[in-house]
A protein has these predicted regions:
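Short Pro-Gly-centered beta-turn/loop motif in secreted/extracellular proteins
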Residues: 78-88, 94
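Structural motif
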Residues: 25-52
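A short, solvent-exposed loop/turn motif at the edges and junctions
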Residues: 90-106
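Bacterial Sec-dependent N-terminal signal peptides
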Residues: 1-31
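Hydrophobic beta-strand segments
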Residues: 53-58
């Protein structure tokens, strides 16, 4: 066996071992009933700047089990989510504010699973200013759920708006405080 073949076989074994460590609910469902989530982690102000980071995926409803994995060096992430559960995904990168998304895989018709369910996400992160209160970024800022009329996963705008508004207020406050234009604990109007 030459060196090239050895490296190829070793690489395949490592990939299989890493895949085997994932919980079942992150692997493709054996009967095709899983949503495939793929996306890119980017800087919010410069979306051409991709970020290497970390994703923490939690099966909130069924086992409360979490799995942490890294994005690629080019910010790419991919995972599967099985039917009939609620999941949260936390996205982070050094020096940036962690953001969360909720995925609800309940109420997806069997016909939709047969066609395949894909969710594409461009996750934009903000640089974390000094004094930013992390508490406002704990709640998921978006919630994806299957829309029967549109026949695809969409995010719930009503659920999202209030969380985003509070996040944006705190981000503006922390940035202004960092620049010295307002008192650190004063809310921004």
């Amino acid at each position: 066996m030459n060196k090239k073949s050895f490296i190829l076989i070793l690489s395949m074994l490592v990939i299989n071992m890493l895949h085997a460590q994932k919980p079942d609910w992150m692997k493709p469902h054996p009967e095709g009933r899983s949503a495939f989530v793929q996306g890119l982690l980017v800087d919010r102000e410069d979306s051409l700047k991709v970020l290497a980071g970390e994703v923490v995926l939690t099966n909130v409803e069924n086992s409360n089990e979490s799995y942490t994995f890294s994005t690629t060096s080019t910010g790419v992430f991919q995972f599967h989510l099985w039917e009939n559960s609620i999941y949260t995904a936390s996205f982070s990168s050094n020096g940036y504010i962690t953001r969360r998304i909720e995925f609800n895989t309940h109420d997806v018709p069997a016909k939709a699973w047969k066609k395949g369910c894909d969710i594409d996400v461009k996750m934009s992160l903000d640089i974390k200013p000094n004094g930013f209160k992390e508490l406002v970024s704990v709640l998921p800022f978006a919630s994806f759920k299957y829309d029967l009329d549109e026949r695809l996963f969409l995010f719930d705008v009503t659920k999202t708006d209030a969380v985003i508004e509070r996040y944006e207020q705190e981000l503006a406050r922390a940035r202004a405080a960092e620049k010295g234009t307002v008192e650190p604990n004063q809310p921004q109007d």
